[in-house]
């Protein structure tokens, strides 16, 4: 599973990543410290497509930083295209942005975004990320089960 997020404050994303890894899902963070992982950015488009398709499940932490960064916009378009083609499963988490204020390039996210409201404290945030991790794991297991029964 790939995890994408460019926000400056990573505690929500780190918490979700820990919960997913605890549940047995290997997570690769595409962005490190608000920047695209250098190895990933040096890949050509074909290699990026292959990497995303190989991992199949993408968790996208949408933030203003991602929407306003050229590298973030590139990866948003990449996951949009691959998701529309059915090559990846995309889970979009709203990282404290107003859905109504999404720029045009992020408008397609409006219908698939999972809203995470502002948390009062770290405990509440951790509980929400735990629940979100549970939901993602259930969806992944259900998807794998459905693939196996169709084959």
Label the predicted regions:
Residues 64-65, 87-101:
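Short beta-alpha junction loops
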Residues 12-14, 70-74, 102-103:
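A short acidic (Asp/Glu
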Residues 10, 36, 67-68, 99-101:
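Flexible, glycine-rich phosphate/dinucleotide-binding loops
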Residues 98-111:
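Glycine-rich, charge-decorated loop segments at or immediately adjacent to ligand/cofactor-binding or catalytic sites
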Residues 118-132:
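Conserved GTP-binding G-domain of TRAFAC-class P-loop NTPases and closely related GTPase folds
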Residues 60-64, 94-96, 111-117:
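Short loop/turn segments at strand-loop or loop-helix junctions that form parts
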Residues 1-61, 80-88, 131-151:
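Conserved N-terminal substructure of TIR/SEFIR domains
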Residues 64-85:
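Conserved TIR/SEFIR loop-to-helix hotspot centered on a Trp-containing motif
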């Amino acid at each position: 599973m790939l995890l994408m997020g460019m926000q400056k404050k990573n505690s929500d994303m780190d918490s979700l990543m820990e919960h997913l890894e605890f549940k047995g899902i290997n997570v690769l963070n595409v962005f490190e410290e608000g920047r695209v992982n250098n190895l990933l950015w040096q890949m050509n488009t074909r290699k990026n497509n292959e990497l995303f398709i190989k991992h199949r499940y993408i968790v996208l932490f949408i933030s203003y930083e991602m929407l306003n960064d050229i590298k973030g916009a590139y990866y948003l378009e990449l996951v949009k295209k691959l998701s529309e083609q059915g090559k990846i499963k995309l889970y979009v988490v709203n990282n404290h942005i107003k859905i109504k204020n999404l720029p045009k390039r992020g408008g397609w996210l409006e219908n698939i975004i999972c809203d995470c409201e502002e948390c009062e404290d770290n405990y509440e945030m951790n509980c929400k990320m735990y629940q979100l991790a549970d939901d993602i794991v259930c969806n992944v297991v259900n998807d794998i089960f459905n693939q196996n029964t169709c084959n």
